[in-house]
Amino acid sequence: MEFDRRKAAALAALASPAPDKSPKGGVDAPIAPLLDALNSHPDLFTTSSCSGRVSVLAQPPPPQQADPGGAKTKKKARGGGWVYISHDPADPEALVEVLFGVKEGGGGGDDELVFRFEPMIVAVECRDAAAAAALVAAAVGAGFRESGITSLQKRVMVALRCSIRMEVPLGQTKELVVSPDYIRYLVRIANSKMEANKKRMGGFLDLLQAKISLEASYLESQDPVLQNGAKHGFGNAKRHVLISLSFYPAFISPHGVILTQEEALPTLSGNTTHCLSTAALEITGEPIEKLFLWGQSACALTVGREHHILTFGGFGGPGRHARRNYSLLVNPGSGLLTELKVTGSPSPRMGHTITVVGNDIYVVGGRSGPSEILNDIWVLERSNNRWSKVDCSGDFFRPRHRHAAAAVDRKVYVFGGLSDDGLCSCMNIMDTASIQWNVISPDDKWPCARHSHSLVSYGSKLFLFGGHDGQRALNDFYSFDTTTLKWNKENTNGKAPSPRFSHCMFIYKDYLGILGGCPIRESSQEIALLNLKHKIWFYVSIPSLSQCLCVRSSSVIIDDDLVIVGGGASCYAFGTRFSQPIKIDLHLLESIFKLAYNKEKEMSVQHGSVSNVDLLEGHEENCNPSDNVKVVIDTATLGSSPLVLQLEKKYAKLAKDILKKFGWLDLTRKVRVSQDNIHVLFPVSKTFHALITDKHLKVQPDDSCVFEELLPFSENKLFGASISLQKALEILLLCRGSILKDEVAISRKASKTPQTIMRELVSVLLDKKGLPSQLLEQLPTRWETLGDIIVLPKTCFKDPLWESVRDDLWPLVAKSLGAQRLARQGKITPNGTRDSTLELLVGNDGWLTHHENGICYSLDATKCMFSSGNRSEKLRMGKLDCRDEVVVDLFAGIGYFVLPFLVKANAKLVYACEWNPHALEALQRNVMDNHVADRCIILEGDNRLTAPKGIADRVCLGLLPSSECSWDTAVRALRAEGGMLHIHGNVNDSDESLWLDNVVKSITNIAKTHGLSWNVTVEHVERVKWYGPHIRHLVVDVKCRAT
């Protein structure tokens, strides 16, 4: 690899005794240990460095501009040389002697003298962007806050630096304007900065060495292949784990002080001994960038029978980051992201709250700009998806943001926040029935004023935790009784969560959970949980949270899942980072709590994706099982649910043979692999569960040796010896498995297809109406999906008899296909605007939003055509590199190819020509929805009159059956030096060569008529689809080059 080659060359140069290209000729001694630490990492090497220096530089004065009104010349380095330089603390008397003791020589009399202190700076090349980001994060945490990524092109470069430099002009070499005492004063300041620079370097070195030591320990516990792979910097997932281990700033105190490993460890929660499984939420539909927000607010929302997450507002989003006011729906099961089509949306904002009251959703306050703090109230009426502003009476509600809100019964309770007057400390109660505010003033027992805290409801109580009081982060914990309107500071057992703000808090059953927030520390990788019945804190580890920034995120409970959306942070040094949505399975919490606080303390717990409970707990003491004999049993949540046995893959063959032999494998469900791809999940019977948890089942200490001998056995060898039921259970026990609920419960029973359901329903209808059963032959066997509309082919239901039962027929067909709206395709009108004749059968409105190739297309399907058959061509156009290109689309339509050019190919500018008013309406909407309107110029009318001339790098001609009417227009649109034409056409498969020859000949002749001497060639022919019998939709890429 090029990186490894460059690193080897750089390290060889460092080790060489020959002087390098720097003025000094070698590495500064104070920085040598830090460079060694950086260069020892497989993903980094240093290219230049300076440990920090005190210097006086003599440089020529800037040249005078002869003509002030003339053109400015390019700025050039002024040159010069050092009068004094030291990489150690400067000697003030030696510098005074240099400046005042010698009156002659040492440079020209007109040279300007500048006293400087420059802190450490190191240039580091990184293997990839992930390593660079991790290194910058570590450097910023160590105090080098000006560090950043300087290049991501051919080489990934990072500059490590800070801002404690100083620069003071002293005058000219023969005319100093300062005194010797002032020089001594400057040296004292510079030396203090030098000392601070040295401490930061030492802290950064300690951090790197501690992390590299941690990485080495991690590697020692891994297999040799991984050790070798990490040593050579292989670009796999495990290497990214090593990056995280090496550079995540876990040993940095909230005050920025570097701690040793021993000092940092006590800050961790001492009883973090359990783990919960997590999974990234794979987003489909709308671009995931729409969820890249912080300061948004979210809640659970039921749509039909499915639970969704509604998010509103926040800062970020696609393109240039800004405050947003779109309403998004996330399906936590499928990951489908859709934008809720609403009317009357609130203004863009962040730092607001969103609260569910009955069927309504209330948005309170927020901030729409640095000085625009809001106190407006909006309600989303779910019946018609309309946002309405609420005019409240009663007490005055101060504008605020970063407050917290929760609902009990029909009232919304708002506490704290930031306003123009400072922090808020009163409790504001809005009665949604009377639309009236009631403000309760604080007393001595109330929580102090704060912002960025959390508030949740539990029965008739509200719980408040953390926040920031303007001076420090808080970790006090209060409850508010909504019946007595009194606050109470809660007394709890166990270690309380660390102080934090901008965190998440949630209620799951009888547990209150807290995670994330600022300051970011190692405890950010765990959830603090309070059992609300026993008032006991305990902690559950979520290792994957180390890769997230759960700061100003939103947490929503959906069934047994905790879904975290949004969140992130911005740093001057390495820009903005947003968190991807994740889902955490909470269904084992009850079991974890019982295990953690079991009075007999006889169980053993391991880290993993679930809590690992010693299956042998309660056995006779003389059993002394091996430490490795552990199986997870979630007795609290299993109930009557179907069960699975989770085992590591290496035990899968042996376990499957045993389960099948004794009839414990449930054959009605599928064996499947876990999400982490490490385990296999076997569906098992309740009989197996009863046997495996039998209190009298014993495993002898030496059984593990027998077990290892059995692993390679085949089924025939294993059971040829007539293995007993007792021995089979003991072997499975030694596999260290987990008995879990089968959440998916995938059934092997064949379900009915939509065609079968449709046939059954329609058959009953025909019998009821006395119509012939032969009509069933006209039922569709395929259909198309556009947004939420199922589109039937025009060839189905052709007999006029269907019209007599249409009112009963179409709802049945829609039901069989699971469609909200149903339509039937008609012929595309063969006119200049190619209008759609799609017939809407179920539903009142033809407007839809269709997602394809990561792009959002909105259109009225009854007026505009949409061809899914062109998907591959749209994908091909999106894969082009058009970053510096101007594109002209002569037949833009709703943006079929305009949007791929803009969204995916990153075209510099696209001119979109269209004359269909319905398509124009959709096109204008689509460039806005996809956030590319600033790079698209829409030209309404006949392209032969409106298209630009002489500016295009490429032209798209997407009209079928032929675009020949605008070939002349396309040639005139290209630049004089030529460009690319993408010409569409419907061509008989036997005439393809003739058509291509005609295209080249025609374009050549057109160019000549316009005085253009071009070499016209066919670069590529794309066969998109069959348009009809022997008729192909072709796209030819025609390259025009000036000769």
Swiss-Prot record:
Coiled coil: none annotated. It comes from Oryza sativa subsp. japonica (Rice). Kelch repeats lie at residues 360-410, 412-460, 461-510, 512-559. Residues 700-1041 are annotated as: tRNA wybutosine-synthesizing protein 2 homolog. GO terms for cellular component: cytoplasm. Residues 53-75 are annotated as: Disordered. One of its GO terms (molecular function) is tRNA 4-demethylwyosine alpha-amino-alpha-carboxypropyltransferase activity. CDD domains: AdoMet_MTases. This is tRNA wybutosine-synthesizing protein 2/3/4. Pathway: tRNA modification; wybutosine-tRNA(Phe) biosynthesis. It catalyses: 4-demethyl-7-[(3S)-3-amino-3-carboxypropyl]wyosine(37) in tRNA(Phe) + S-adenosyl-L-methionine = 7-[(3S)-3-amino-3-carboxypropyl]wyosine(37) in tRNA(Phe) + S-adenosyl-L-homocysteine + H(+); 4-demethylwyosine(37) in tRNA(Phe) + S-adenosyl-L-methionine = 4-demethyl-7-[(3S)-3-amino-3-carboxypropyl]wyosine(37) in tRNA(Phe) + S-methyl-5'-thioadenosine + H(+).
